[in-house]
A protein has these predicted regions:
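C-terminal helix/juxtamembrane-tail motif
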Residues: 211-229
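Short clusters of hydrophobic/aromatic residues that line enzyme substrate/ligand-binding pockets
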Residues: 45, 83-85, 157-158, 184, ...
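Short coil/turn segments at secondary-structure boundaries
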Residues: 111-112, 209-211
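Conserved beta-strand edge residues that scaffold enzyme active sites
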Residues: 35-36, 191, 212-213
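GST-like domain detector, emphasizing the conserved glutathione-binding G-site
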Residues: 1-134, 138, 153, 225-226
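GST superfamily/GST-like fold recognition
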Residues: 105, 109-114, 158-186, 192-198
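Surface-exposed helix-capping loop/turn segments at secondary-structure junctions
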Residues: 80, 149-161, 202-209
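Non-transmembrane alpha-helical segments in soluble domains
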Residues: 71-75, 96-99, 141-144, 148, ...
Length: 229
């Protein structure tokens, strides 16, 4: 098999790539990289991804990193439905607008809050200062409100009437914050309906990709983390 996906389904962009490949019926060989065990730090993996992150893809001996770039490549290299990344330049631009916006918004703010509330205490054994943590939470909430009030105000998907790669990336990022006890859908009806549409359009692979995250979310809730900031 010429296409290899290096991934860990606890990684938001890894889930997005996994879902896309499955939904589009693109054959690939999955190479699980266990982040918890530090497998991404192995010298062998550094030859695939110089910065030792996931996901990464190897296609016919050519290595690729960065999920947005990989998704664009897959849309151009394989015969996938046009709505994922339209050939029409204006429609394509709408997808690119979100992809560029996401870096410093959905990706940065959701991932930062998750890291500061869950990962940093796990790695250091020290809880985050509540006031500092609240600042991360506020930035994340503002991003979710922007999604609710701008990106999803008058359309079914982020960039139009049909699902695109932007929707998979965005939804996978947002799912992560459930693990730290935050419900992104609360008081956001547009976002709630959109996330359901994304899951339905990519079923059963969306659900499959989130099995582990959902299990960990339940475990964290039992431990009472949801009662923190």
């Amino acid at each position: 098999m010429s296409l290899k996906l290096y991934y860990d389904l606890l990684s938001q962009p890894s889930r997005a790539l996994y879902i896309f490949l499955k939904v589009c019926d693109i054959p690939f060989e999955g190479k699980f990289i266990n982040l918890a065990k530090g497998e991404h730090l192995n010298p062998e993996y550094q030859r695939i991804h110089p910065f030792q992150k996931v996901p990464a893809i190897e296609h016919n001996g050519f290595n690729m990193m960065e999920s947005v770039a990989i998704l664009r490549y897959l849309c151009r290299e394989f015969k996938v439905a046009d709505h994922w990344y339209p050939q029409d330049l204006k429609l394509q631009l709408k997808v690119d607008e979100y992809l560029e916006w996401q870096h410093l918004n959905t990706r940065l703010n959701c991932a930062s809050y998750f890291f500061m509330k869950y990962m940093k205490p796990l790695l250091t054994g020290k809880s985050m200062n509540p006031e500092s943590l609240m600042q991360y939470k506020k930035r994340m909430m503002q991003t979710l409100d922007d999604l609710e009030n701008f990106w999803l105000k008058d359309k079914n998907f982020l960039t139009g009437s049909e699902i695109s790669i932007a929707d998979i990336l965005g939804s996978c990022e947002i799912e992560q914050v459930r693990m730290v006890g935050y419900n992104p859908e609360e008081n956001r009806p547009h976002l709630t309906a959109w996330m359901k549409r994304v899951a339905d359009k990519t079923s059963p692979y969306y659900q499959e990709a989130h099995v582990l995250l959902n299990k960990l979310t339940s475990k964290v809730k039992q431990e009472g983390l949801k009662n923190a900031v």
